Amino acid sequence: MKDKIIGKGTWLDKVANSLIIREKKLGRSLDLIKVESGLGASGIPHIGSTGDAVRAYGIGLALNNLGFKSELITYSDDMDGLRKIPTGFPLWLDDYIAKPVSTIPDPFGNCHKSYGEHMSSLLLESLDKVGIKFNYRSASDVYKSGILAREIDCILSNNELLGKKIFNLVSQDKYIDVLPYFPVCNNCGRLYVARAEKYLSNERKVLYSCSGSKIGTKKISGCGHKGESDISKGEGKLAWKVEFAARWKALDIRFEAYGKDIMDSVRVNDWVSTSLLNFPHPLHVKYEMFLDKRGKKISKSAGNVLTPQMWLKYGTPASILLLLFKRISGTRHIGLDDIPTLMDEYDYYEDIYFDKIKENNNSKKIKLKGIYEYVNKLNPPYNTLKHIPYRILVQQASFFTGEGRSDNIFLRLKKYGLVEEKTDDLINKIS
């Protein structure tokens, strides 16, 4: 018996269908299904950061295709403290280690209000360029507005139970003795260095002492201040082990993918969400991390970042979307030299879609056509144009510079019989 084709036959459709089945069993409203992507704000966003948001958006598209409304929430973790200076950043940032990135000056001038806003803007800019629609939320605004106050209160009021459960789940004993909350010391302005010692539930305040902490390999001294942190005014933040759960419930999130590097945090957050906050945790998909060509993890702070901006300098938005939509499983080694292959692969998918290339395997054909439609955000073009191998375009582009460059390249391609007319698509690829 052949497997039933769901939606457009892609992994996006399978996940969306599983999500709908799960939500119906839970009896939750399906009027608007929110999917989420967390955005790190501590360093330059890389292609993997973009991937998390793009895939979540893809699930939203698949939900739309199945007849349901969806919304992508992009959540910037700009309350996180700066743990180290990313490669190539100004050394004066050393004075701001452990301070929330939303309170650190913009290291690249005055174009943004803070370090965190600058880093977040780079990722949001890339999402705009590839045509992703989203609702942006920043952690600093969410905490300051008190949106998470009810969830924080529930979590801190159950800290003894929570500390034991975290130890049972991931063998971490830290939160048996310490509250899973990082106050911002109101004297030195740092996170992580102030030890949360007691929660006053009636006042919704955390008592702390700024005693210092080890961040990575660096010991950060505390200033000795003793104070209190109001959980409803953004004077601190939850630890990652419990923070996801709080925002899932507060923002009504139904889907969020995650990388295997934070698997332990997700396990704990799932329990917190379901068992403490009485909000069945979102459906998840686990993805492997992107690696560079040497097999090293692409890192915001290690200096081997492949950014979406770098990619879009040479490739089209469609090439990024194809990279991220065609599959989710397996580790991939990526670099700029993959762009020509993906550009030509997109043309192949387009030829399959318009039946210029025959594919005898029907399920494969449906899947390839489905991926093409999702790359085009369910609004594919009405017809296809003649394709030019991308490496030939790159070669021709290297021959011509200056004024009239596009015209000269077009004339050369026309001479070779590769094009008949100058189109917007051709000009975009040349430029």
Give the positions of each predicted feature.
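Flexible loop/turn segments at secondary-structure boundaries
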Residues: A41-I44, M79-R83, K144-S145, F290-K297, ...
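A glycine-rich helix N-cap at a beta->alpha junction
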Residues: W92-V130
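Residue-level signal for inorganic ion chemistry
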Residues: H46, I155, T316
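N-terminal catalytic cores of NTP/NDP-binding nucleotidyl/phosphoryl-transfer enzymes
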Residues: M1-G88, E243-S265
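Charged, often glycine-rich, active-site loop that binds/positions anionic groups
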Residues: D80-Y96, E151-I152, L156, K297, ...
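Anion (oxyanion) recognition and catalysis
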Residues: N64, D128, L156
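Catalytic adenosine-cofactor/nucleotide-binding cores of aminoacyl-tRNA synthetases and other
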Residues: D261, V266, Y287-S431
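Active-site cores that bind ATP or allylic diphosphates and position pyrophosphate for catalysis
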Residues: I132-A302, P308
